Regions:
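Short beta-rich binding modules
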Residues: 1-238
Length: 238
């Protein structure tokens, strides 16, 4: 399910359903957990979130379509994300969205060496749809990701480009602290609380003794994400 990202809690401005130009600026690996699908047996599922900042909305006038710049009322870009199972199996949603984003299928060799961090700074088009939340309120979600007109480009972003690598973050608690693990801590502390909870309750973090690790304040500013799962049984759409 896609979700809007805000810098804090409370109210936020929402995108409306439509077609948007966007740039990937953040990737977050929230780890593995046991989950069941439609009452089936539980299985391990590793989740990753892709974040995009939105720059333009597709508009129409007298049958002519054009792109209009869009920002929130304070001038910041809208931000939206989508949750994926970290699998490149051909039936996995991540694989399908990446293929649509690229505009062509992957070769077997490309799948073996795909680095998800290469998505940072890459342009795309997003199809955003509306849906009704469980509490009855209206929300929006990323339905599809497409190759933009003119092809995918690597561009600068307004938000910092960053990737949260859980494997690196975990090393901070296993006596392997270094500049990269400190950088993961910085990213972690800026994540929303619900996402921190996902990370803290992951199988990876539950296997680490974090009780003796005490941080009095956010660390000063000082790898790549874990390999994507090649799970042949991964075919759960979301």
């Amino acid at each position: 399910m896609g979700l809007l990202v805000s810098s804090g809690g409370g109210d936020y401005e929402s995108l409306k359903p439509g077609r948007y130009q966007a740039i990937c600026y953040k990737i977050v690996d929230v780890g593995t957990r046991m989950e069941s699908f439609k009452g089936g047996p539980e299985k391990k599922r590793t989740l990753v979130y892709l974040y995009w900042e939105v720059s333009h909305i597709q508009m129409g006038n007298d049958g002519e379509e054009f792109w209009d710049e869009i920002t929130m009322s304070d001038g910041r870009p809208f931000s939206i994300s989508k949750k994926y199972t970290a699998s490149l199996n051909e039936n996995a949603t991540l694989h399908l969205d990446l293929k649509s984003w690229r505009g062509k299928p992957f070769t077997a060799e490309q799948l073996k060496s795909f680095d998800i961090e290469n998505l940072l700074g890459k342009t795309c088009e997003l199809e955003v749809i509306g849906y009704q939340k469980q509490d009855g309120s209206e929300g929006v979600a990323v339905e599809s990701v497409y190759k933009p007109d003119g092809g995918v480009k690597n561009v600068s972003t307004i938000n910092d480009k960053e990737a949260f690598d859980l494997d690196l973050y975990k090393q901070e608690f296993t006596g392997e602290s270094n500049e990269d693990t400190k950088r993961m801590l910085d990213i972690y502390y800026d994540l929303p609380d619900w996402m921190k909870d996902l990370i803290d309750n992951s199988i990876e973090m539950k296997a680490v003794d974090t009780d003796s690790y005490v941080v009095d304040s956010k660390p000063n500013d000082s790898g790549g994400l874990s390999d994507l799962a090649k799970d042949d049984d991964e075919n759960i759409p979301f």
